[in-house]
Amino acid sequence: MRILITNDDSISAPVLPFLIQWAKKLGEVTVIVPKFEQSGKSHSIELHKPFEVLACDRFPGVRTYTVDSSPADCVRYAILGLREKFDLVISGINRGYNIGTDILYSGTASAAFEAVCLGCKALALSTGFEEFDTALAHLDEVWEMLQKHDLFAKNDIYNVNIPEGEVKGVRFTRQGGPFYSDEFPSIGDNLVRPTGICVYKDSHDYSVDTDAVLHGYISISPLIPQRTNMPLFHELSKLNP
C-alpha cells in the first residue's frame, strides 16, 4: 500500500514521527506537510503566487517534502505535482478535535477531502490538545475496525476523533453542530483578536461526533465532499422541464 501523510500542524508537529512509524506497518510512506502551522485554513489553495517545496531528510528512509502552503495544496502537489498515486491519504494526527461544524474550518479534514476529490481514499485523524499517547495507542484498533467491515469499499473518507484519557469504546457517528464560536474583542489600532468560545451543548446522543468524543468514545464518521441536499434535489428535479 502506498500511503501519503499530511497534516495542518506542519513538519514540526510532535506526533508526526510516531504516526509515520505506525503507518510504515501498513505500507510505503511519503510525507508532504506544510512548512508552517496551517490550522483553520480549511480547503484553501494558492492560486496567485508560487510557493516553496523543499525535500528534507528529517525522517530517515521516508521521502519527505515541506510545502509553504495549505494542507490541501500539500495533497494537490503530491498527486498533481509529483504525478503519483496513493492508496491512502492520512491527514493528522491533529492537535485538537475536528468535530461538529469545526470540520468546515479544518485544514486536516480538508486535506482528506482534497484527496478524495483527486481519487484517493482518505483518513482524517484528530485528538485533543493535551496529549497524543491515547490516540497513538488506539490507531491499530481504528484501522482493524475499518478493515474488518471493509469500510473503504463503502465510503472514501472517514473522520476519526480519539478522545484523551480513558477510551470507553468506538462509535460510528455523524457530524454534530457547533462546538466552538468566536468573539472579536478590539485590541486597538483597528485590530480585533478572534477569541474562541465553547458553545457546545451536550445532548448525550452518542451517534453525534461531538457527544461521543466528549463522553470518551472514539468517533468514526463517514463523510462526503458532495454538498448537494440530495433529498431536496430529487424533489426539485421533478420541476425541471
How would you name each of these model-derived features?
Residues 3, 13-85:
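A cross-family phosphate/adenosyl-ligand binding-site feature
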Residues 6, 32-34, 91-94, 125-126, ...:
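Short beta-strand segments
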Residues 9:
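Active-site metal-binding loops of divalent metal-dependent hydrolases
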Residues 78-83, 112-121:
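Alpha-helix C-terminal capping segments
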Residues 88:
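Short, Asp-centered acidic motifs that coordinate Mg2+ and/or phosphate
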Residues 97-106:
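Glycine/threonine-rich flexible loop motifs
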Residues 116-136:
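Glycine-rich phosphate/pyrophosphate-binding loops
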Residues 136-241:
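Electrostatically charged, flexible surface regions
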